[in-house]
């Protein structure tokens, strides 16, 4: 496994060659390669990478913290915790930012430009053989101007499931995000109301989401 700095002309292929602020994943024990920056078949991010998390990663705490912040404190969809029975069998995915928060980032939450490792979350779960759902998709409020994060999380989620064996990949998408998903090769199946919030049940076009090379771990990742 090697570290990749996509913003430089040269590629750093060792931990020592990667700047400290560029490699929160390396500092957390996660290797980084080119596929982790993928956003689509033809586009990559230059600031964010996307990772399946393992239970021994200290990024797991950031994953749960961001989920709670978005779905409990901000959206009030849940009261104290957004965790449910699916988390016991789901695979957590996190988006990482590389470097300090810049002046182009909305700092309305008062982060004060502090470094934030986990800036986006999503989970995937196989509810039946080869039937996958994505859920709990969210982006840190200070980074929502960066459409790359949501795009990269969706790409990572669907391509991972497609690589592990997937005939259908579904998600319940809040109404305000339906247009964004349609641009990413999803189709709406039906409109739903969940906890008083309008959603669409949507399905990904698997022919667009090239199966990822990452092998399915033998043990579940959530701790």
Model-derived regions, located:
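Conserved active-site alpha-helix within GNAT-family acetyltransferase domains
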Residues: 175-198
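Short, well-ordered beta-strand micro-motif
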Residues: 94-96, 201-205
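Short amphipathic alpha-helix that is part of the acyltransferase structural core
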Residues: 2-92, 96-102, 117, 213-218, ...
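Conserved acetyl-CoA-binding loop-helix of GNAT-fold acetyltransferases
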Residues: 139, 145-159
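Conserved beta-strand in the GNAT
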Residues: 94, 104-109, 114-126, 130-138
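Conserved GNAT acetyl-CoA-binding A-motif
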Residues: 161-174
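Short acidic/glycine-enriched loop/turn segments that link adjacent beta-strands
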Residues: 87-89, 128-130, 195-199
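Short alpha-helical functional segments enriched in proximate histidine and acidic residues
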Residues: 70, 160, 180
